[in-house]
Swiss-Prot record:
GO terms, molecular function: 4 iron, 4 sulfur cluster binding; lipoate synthase activity; metal ion binding
Keyword Iron-sulfur among record annotations: yes
Leading EC class: transferase
Record region (Disordered): 27-61
Residue range of the transit peptide in the UniProt record, numbered on this chain: 1-29
Biased composition (Low complexity): 43-55
Keywords in alphabetical order: 4Fe-4S, Iron, Iron-sulfur, Metal-binding, Mitochondrion, S-adenosyl-L-methionine, Transferase, Transit peptide
Catalyzed reactions: [[Fe-S] cluster scaffold protein carrying a second [4Fe-4S](2+) cluster] + N(6)-octanoyl-L-lysyl-[protein] + 2 oxidized [2Fe-2S]-[ferredoxin] + 2 S-adenosyl-L-methionine + 4 H(+) = [[Fe-S] cluster scaffold protein] + N(6)-[(R)-dihydrolipoyl]-L-lysyl-[protein] + 4 Fe(3+) + 2 hydrogen sulfide + 2 5'-deoxyadenosine + 2 L-methionine + 2 reduced [2Fe-2S]-[ferredoxin]
Name of the molecule in the record: Lipoyl synthase, mitochondrial
Stored PROSITE patterns: RADICAL_SAM
Catalytic activity, EC: 2.8.1.8
UniProt xrefs under InterPro entries: Aldolase_TIM, Elp3/MiaA/NifB-like_rSAM, LIAS_N, Lipoyl_synth, rSAM
Amino acid sequence: MASPAPLQRLQAPLRRSLARAAVLSSRTYATIPSPSDPGLTQSSPSPAASTTPAKKAPRPSYFKDTTVASFSEFVGSQSAPLSLSEAYEIKTAEVGPAGRKRTITRLPEWLKTPIPSSGANPNFGKIKADLRGLNLHTVCEEARCPNIGECWGGNDKSAATATIMLMGDTCTRGCRFCSVKTNRKPPPLDPHEPENTAEALARWGLGYVVLTSVDRDDLADGGARHFAETIRRIKQKKPTLLVEALTGDFMGDLDMVKIVAESGLDVYAHNVETVEGLTPYVRDRRATFRQSLKVLEHVKAVRGKEGIITKTSIMLGLGEQEQEIWDTLRELRKIDVDVVTFGQYMRPTKRHLKVEKYVTPDEFDLWKQRALDMGFLYCASGPLVRSSYKAGEAFIENVLRKRAGERAAASASLDQVVAAEETKAL
């Protein structure tokens, strides 16, 4: 019997591999020599390759979930660093089907943040679970804040912060920059919310907390008493916890402002949001620039200039002019507002106001310095800064604790003087 052919003596998988290699080697391919392969020589191109130019090899895909470069990326980059104009260049793109394409503006690199997830940061999931279990809402989620991953992502709960939104998740106003749900008749207030909020904050072991709320124009007091009761419950459970309240304007009712201001809070915040000229186009028609100034001014009248810190926030990128920003800062200093923050307006949905300008980080730094030069106690200014910004909270916490220490020292000194006088009298 004749011996089998050499190929037939091989195992089946190996036979298939050799057969596939033989077929592939019989085909003609255009090859592009690589500089890294010195032994590779370019063969004569096939007729098909001579008429069609070889396409440039695409850059490899690369994904990174943080905006901060690692050390190896920093020292190993083969490309030259971008110039300032290149770094701040606003890019556009054409989207849509053929014949109906439209140009859109890409989000600048300095506004991009990693998408938060419970898998990447377990603490994010823990805080979210606590909030759901106690039926609490946060402005971080409702207003789609870009800093939610940073603020909720501390190494432990004491390093994390969350801005609790009281009185539900539905607002009676419809500001053109805000993505919070609106309705003329929101659900009634949750009577357990003050206790649940205090319980959650005591459980986290925070040193500083921010409370805010939707506007509730459907309530006789605008929710002022509910706000004040929540603050009192928090102070009962943890007297050392510093509380910041970011309130609405209570439709200009200064008696309601007084109720919240006297509830034991440490920082009273109310946002003017934008310059006076743009207020009618940006905010709900029931909110006015002058009404907001009266709220902030009345807080100082109730608690005294040194008795409480007042704070406000301004969005940039809505079409405001430089002189209008100057005028706004001067108005705020007239009524002794202590803290101001600047942040980039970012359009939450297509139904909201368009972004007129993406303000560069350098411009934000400039406005921070200008605000400090005007006498503001503190200014947080940056593209991703929001009114309840984590870095700003740390600074204000230090100021408040320093003031408390000074008051305690002054009180102790006064007690010593009184005791000395009483001793002399004896």
